Amino acid sequence: ESGQKEVFIDLEEEIIYEQYLETHLGDILANQSSSEDQKAEIFSKVSTNVVKDSFETSLGLGTMDYDTLRRTQSLVKNALIFIAETHSLKALSKMIGHDYKTYEHATKVLWFTVAFLRKNPDILEQIEPTYLTFDETQKKELLKQCGVGAILHDIGKAFVSQDILNKNGPLTTIEWEMIKRHPLNGLAMLLDSECPVFVKKAVLHHHEDFNGSGYPMGLDGQNIHILARVLRIVDVFDAMTSRRPYKEAMSPTMVAQIMIGIPPEKIKNE
């Protein structure tokens, strides 16, 4: 109301403010008096902080602890409600094309994965075929766990230095080998967690290609978990639509056209 667009707060107050946003995220996203753009910005901020904390905590402990996993699950639960609204997705889509950073990338992979699976319920049902029935309650729980897998898919990069992840130029052979280990590191961090087996498989397999040319195991075809194949597509889409130090972002339409033209033996037809 005063017309002031910026205020400065000290670090301690900022931490308290961020904790408040995370604790009350569900109420904030349901608040009808806030614009969708404002809510999308808050959701993005909270999710980025949760992912960042997940990386740092897991790196320190060498595993995903109970409290960190619970924070991630709570975030995804709120995300499912928010992303269900078309106007919310439109607000979130305005962030496509921003810089590619590991924490922000994890958040966008969550958005895209949830949207993709909602539009393709037949694929969602294949992710955990052990369900004897597939009612709405199970569907919501399965979608939540898929969201957890999506937001944690790169958790193994916690072991890779930011200098390598953000390097402006080609990687050395040693640096590339370190990058290629992140799915294995991710599995190791989640191995003793309560995450379902299919989430752990998705984290391990998300850089495998349908023709066996991916990493870290060189799996092919149906040996790659179907959620990992979804994450592979979403991962590539976000990377290509994001700005990098060495390239500008491509438009979503252009990327979709390119991906449709990718040989089917590379990513199949999902």
Label for each model-derived stretch:
Residues 99, 206-210:
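Short, internal active-site loops enriched in acidic
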Residues 34-180, 187-194:
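Acidic/His-rich, divalent-metal-binding segments that scaffold phosphate/diphosphate chemistry
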Residues 5-6, 89, 152, 185, ...:
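A general structural signal for well-ordered secondary-structure junctions
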Residues 166-189, 210-270:
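Divalent-cation-assisted or electrostatically stabilized phosphate/pyrophosphate-binding catalytic cores
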Residues 1-63, 70-73, 82, 86, ...:
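Terminal helices and disordered tails flanking the catalytic cores of nucleotide-processing hydrolases
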Residues 122-148, 190-206, 224-233, 248-254, ...:
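Acidic/histidine metal-binding catalytic segments
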